[in-house]
């Protein structure tokens, strides 16, 4: 049994202004927020990052400013360096190494890196042992035994399974306590559960981050043209909602939950924060503190 839900939030470089407003509320108005919820980390990568993967990044905030903000609030930073196609010559990339040094030397909570490539994982262990490693969901671990083996790897402090394992309760229950502590569920994925191209989609992002000239992946999922909609994600059989966390996952011994949203707009990411962290009766107050005033026009 776990009593605290620990959330790992998107937008380390994309949503500085949002978190600059949200985190003070989280500290000073705890009555707005659910009991037993904490922010474990904020993850992301700057735009045009060679080691980046998973999603195209568009974050432009000053890394020093974001790290100072997270130190102030005692929150871990995670670099999303989940490119699956890295080669030896890519490891010397100056920009990515500079970011790793920044996190390794920043003080405050221990920071980490989300990785796919075993080559990169080995390099980071050797050169930046201060950083913990997270096994990326871009590995698309849909077979439970492969996922179990990943949790057994000492390299990783956390492992994010494919979202289609979210409701494999009978198998998840068989994990040992130490394994459960490493599991980090992706809660709000909007991808079609029948998708067979998820790994290929991630590989396209990896190739393009390496500067390769390749076409964008064309999603064949039903309603793909709509893009991400939170309402659609909520209807997914793999969706993990607040009540699921309280009544199922915490009692089973799981406590880490990842919220996706790096490639989305800050308004939608705020809705994720409101849904997962803020009591319904206080959500309007949080909106008012962050952006909503009596002169705001939408149309």
Locate the predicted segments by residue.
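Active-site pocket-lining/capping segments in soluble small-molecule metabolic enzymes
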Residues: 1-150, 155-299
